[in-house]
Amino acid sequence: MTAIVFDKVWKEYGDHVVLERIDLTIAARSFLALVGPSGCGKTTFLRLLLGEEKPTRGKILVGGKPLKAEPDADRGVVFQRYSVFPHLTVLANVMIGREFEQSCLMGKLFGARRRAIEDEARHLLEAVGLKGHEDKYPAALSGGMQQRLALAQAINRKPKILLLDEPFGALDPGIRADIHVLIRRIWNENELTVVMVTHDLSEAFRLGTRVIAFERPRNRPEELERYGATIGEVSAQAIVAASGASITQDFEVWPRKIANALPDPDSRPDLKIAPTNGAKPPG
């Protein structure tokens, strides 16, 4: 079953091409990890999926239908910096999305409906390891706990797609490992398709069922803005074979090693993108 399809998608800002002819099919329930150097279009790709940006050309389908222009309950998102409401308690942070969804009176519910949403929120907070912190404010939580809260917010409306924009970048290694376990559990226990941006290759291969690399392999300084990032599916074995390096190294330290593991678009003028759905290149 297909969850998301990018059909020849381009994203341009005037003469600046950010993404170039993206053809990508993402299966339902998959965990897609996106890697690549800064400025290569990973976050733009995520913003397209979230509905914050529109393709310049091409189309995006979700569940076989055109992507809705505005973010909705089907798409949850967690950013690198904790996207929580500082003036609300932990419990209220989780409840607020459902309250706005179901209430037509200033986002507030009362009586049985409010109790039902509160019970669900408490259960979710327990599931992400925040039981006992319901009445605290985000400022009283550690970084890892705030990210757990952001995850609870993101999945509270039972989305079909969870978007993660470098969600672990601000956490220390020990806390990151704990959140990795939590993310995998959430993904396994829910009907979720996950798309995650990360700069950490080992994290990408540890969590993802697929790893997609964004790269601008052409070297034409005079036409730098005329080419957008292409994508290609890459394996840990391909990276090691191309570079002789361990995938535990940080991506920003050695971005070219991903490029060495990908096809060279300039060698195939007719092929702007490495196929990612198992199809063979034309020709």
Give, region by region, the residue ranges found by the protein language model.
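Helix-to-loop junction immediately C-terminal to a conserved catalytic motif
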Residues: 50
